[in-house]
Regions:
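Active-site-adjacent structural elements in enzyme catalytic cores
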Residues: 17-232
Length: 232
């Protein structure tokens, strides 16, 4: 177990920790190569409910075990994020979708075949195993398969999906430069993975697939017209 230093607030019955003065492990990686020793080190931190800042195909993300209420609460506290706002997750492959979502519509197969791996987050009905604190106490979950070799390898090695919230304080700009990520989060998280400057640009596009007709909740890297042709 980790020892927490900082202020504690109540988050719908869960303890949220604002970290201070932790020892942060910096791990520098080649995002195109999955070196087992590097990935294994970070995966072990996640399995122990650690918080990891990691590179993606868009910006840097803040990752914890999506099944651990205490780890999820740490992520909310670090971002100073409204606990009523849910966190999405990243998966390692298409098969992992069933560990986080149920009642998946048939249109899902067309969208994931066209746009995954890539910057598309699909909102689905959440698996009952997912803690309420991750979902903002709703019943849906955002899921993404990233176009990032190292990140997919990390999630596969960890053995569970991890949170995909951007590594920034609530209301602040997303981070694509690892130097900035270290400035913001060193001493506050257990590990920062330096995978170089990420692609940046736009965040992922978010599509709600929980209703009869899908709807775009946020237009991002994938333009709406490329998606709407699948259901209009």
């Amino acid at each position: 177990m980790f020892t927490y230093k900082g202020d504690i607030i109540d988050c719908f019955g869960f303890a949220v920790y604002y970290e201070r003065d932790m020892d942060t492990r910096i791990v520098r990686v080649n995002p195109e190569k999955c070196i087992p020793s590097e990935i294994g080190l970070v995966a072990r931190i996640l399995r122990k409910d650690g918080v990891v800042v990691y590179p993606t195909d868009t910006f840097y993300g803040l990752g914890v075990n999506c099944y651990s209420p205490s780890a999820i609460s740490r992520a909310y506290g670090l971002k100073k994020r409204d606990p009523a706002k849910p966190l999405s997750v990243v998966i390692s492959d298409r098969e992992m979708i069933h560990s986080v979502a149920i009642d998946i519509p048939s249109l899902f197969e067309s969208l994931e075949a066209e746009f995954w791996p890539g910057p598309l987050t699909l909102v689905l009905h959440a698996n009952p195993l997912i803690p309420d604190v991750l979902l903002g106490f709703q019943k849906t979950i955002g899921v993404r398969l990233p176009d990032h070799t190292w990140l997919r390898g990390l999630v596969k090695t960890a053995g569970f999906p991890i949170t995909a919230t951007s590594a920034n304080l609530a209301g602040k700009a997303e981070i694509s430069d690892p130097v900035k990520a270290i400035q913001v989060f060193q001493g506050k998280v257990d590990c920062i993975v330096d995978g170089g400057i990420t692609r940046g640009g736009s965040s992922s596009t978010v599509v709600d697939m929980t209703k009869e007709k899908p709807s775009i909740l946020r237009e991002g890297a994938i333009p709406s017209h490329q998606l709407e042709r699948f259901w209009d």
